[in-house]
Amino acid sequence: MSLYLKAEKIQSWRVLIMACAGFIFNTTEFVPVAMLSDIAQSFDMQTADTGLMMTVYAWTVLIMSLPAMLATGNMERKSLLIKLFIIFIVGHILLVIAWNFWILLLARMCIALAHSVFWSITASLVMRISPKHKKTQALGMLAIGTALATILGLPIGRIVGQLVGWRVTFGIIAVLALSIMFLIIRLLPNLPSKNAGSIASLPLLAKRPLLLWLYVTTAIVISAHFTAYTYIEPFMIDVGHLDPNFATAVLLVFGFSGIAASLLFNRLYRFAPTKFIVVSMSLLMFSLLLLLFSTEAIIAMFSLVFIWGIGISCIGLSLQMRVLKLAPDATDVATAIYSGIFNAGIGAGALFGNLATTYLGLNEIGYTGAALGLIGFIIFITTHLKYRHTFLLQNNKKITAL
């Protein structure tokens, strides 16, 4: 094997490790969705109230993403990753022993702190450590890792939770995180901070209208998705009258749709980025609008959830790629803001879902999400039409507004 091929193989393994890290972080963020009923029962709470643990997690990421990124902006990236995993593991140990819901929320906030920095640096890191001609594929690999969190993480987490308790699920995640941390120590090179940006980058980013409106669109569209997705488990059981095993299968289908979305993104996004986003948003709205009707037949729900998963996964990938394109001079800061806003959308969606469930009924979460999705869709189309011919100047380079 030539030195070039050997180096490329090592780089590919490094990307795979980061994809596994993404899998772990996404699994722990969303696995409560599959165990809300069990967690609520443990603390003698209403399921809708337990869903607020998603809100607290997401809003911790929102609040901490930018300040934490600025505080760690000059740190060598490998050592930073190791520190993040230590915080992540300690948070999960606290989750396992949580003796009341408030301790559980404290543990989730600890994990969210690690999350806020991890997702601020991961996309740009993956592109740095990947083979030169496989940058887009590397981002796609990271996306597959996050998609596997819903394919394997959520269903397996639910199964483990049902068999031996939700605490064991979080304990297993801690063990997996420890294994990945050792792989990072062993295989990742030292990675000095590069194009991370600083507090001085904020005024420059604030002068890029396409980027600012992209953040607004992200917050609203992600809120639309999580308005329904946060409560999909009780929706399927209480409204759809599905057996809990079928509910697990639906989550599995949602996860597989993420892999399909990653493949579509790798093949199609570069040819027509804006059309790709528009179609993806349309799929999301269509799915949420028809969510209640899909409960009439099992096959309808499986089909709709698959389409829904493709839509939201493509949205997440394409919006993140656009952020990187619009802020190549401050990738980590711009991504930190994106990550914070993305999680604000998760928290707001969980809250909207809670309000819809409480005041309108669980069967209305799809309509509520679709209404929010329409608002985000209109904002995206309007701002694209207004700014599609603009150019952003940074470091004497023209950055085409895609």
Swiss-Prot record:
<comment type="similarity">
    <text>Belongs to the major facilitator superfamily. SotB (TC 2.A.1.2) family.</text>
</comment>
<keyword id="KW-0813">Transport</keyword>
<dbReference type="InterPro" id="IPR036259">
    <property type="entry name" value="MFS_trans_sf"/>
</dbReference>
<dbReference type="InterPro" id="IPR023495">
    <property type="entry name" value="Sugar_effux_transptr_put"/>
</dbReference>
<dbReference type="GO" id="GO:0005886">
    <property type="term" value="C:plasma membrane"/>
</dbReference>
<keyword id="KW-0762">Sugar transport</keyword>
<feature type="transmembrane region" description="Helical">
    <location>
        <begin position="168"/>
        <end position="188"/>
    </location>
</feature>
<feature type="transmembrane region" description="Helical">
    <location>
        <begin position="109"/>
        <end position="129"/>
    </location>
</feature>
<feature type="transmembrane region" description="Helical">
    <location>
        <begin position="15"/>
        <end position="35"/>
    </location>
</feature>
<feature type="transmembrane region" description="Helical">
    <location>
        <begin position="137"/>
        <end position="157"/>
    </location>
</feature>
<feature type="transmembrane region" description="Helical">
    <location>
        <begin position="333"/>
        <end position="353"/>
    </location>
</feature>
<feature type="transmembrane region" description="Helical">
    <location>
        <begin position="365"/>
        <end position="385"/>
    </location>
</feature>
<keyword id="KW-1133">Transmembrane helix</keyword>
<feature type="transmembrane region" description="Helical">
    <location>
        <begin position="276"/>
        <end position="296"/>
    </location>
</feature>
<dbReference type="GO" id="GO:0015144">
    <property type="term" value="F:carbohydrate transmembrane transporter activity"/>
</dbReference>
<dbReference type="InterPro" id="IPR020846">
    <property type="entry name" value="MFS_dom"/>
</dbReference>
<feature type="transmembrane region" description="Helical">
    <location>
        <begin position="297"/>
        <end position="317"/>
    </location>
</feature>
<protein>
    <recommendedName>
        <fullName>Probable sugar efflux transporter</fullName>
    </recommendedName>
</protein>
<dbReference type="InterPro" id="IPR050189">
    <property type="entry name" value="MFS_Efflux_Transporters"/>
</dbReference>
<keyword id="KW-0472">Membrane</keyword>
<keyword id="KW-0997">Cell inner membrane</keyword>
<keyword id="KW-1003">Cell membrane</keyword>
<feature type="transmembrane region" description="Helical">
    <location>
        <begin position="209"/>
        <end position="229"/>
    </location>
</feature>
<dbReference type="InterPro" id="IPR011701">
    <property type="entry name" value="MFS"/>
</dbReference>
<feature type="transmembrane region" description="Helical">
    <location>
        <begin position="84"/>
        <end position="104"/>
    </location>
</feature>
<keyword id="KW-0812">Transmembrane</keyword>
<comment type="function">
    <text>Involved in the efflux of sugars. The physiological role may be the reduction of the intracellular concentration of toxic sugars or sugar metabolites.</text>
</comment>
<feature type="transmembrane region" description="Helical">
    <location>
        <begin position="51"/>
        <end position="71"/>
    </location>
</feature>
<feature type="transmembrane region" description="Helical">
    <location>
        <begin position="245"/>
        <end position="265"/>
    </location>
</feature>
<dbReference type="Pfam" id="PF07690">
    <property type="entry name" value="MFS_1"/>
</dbReference>
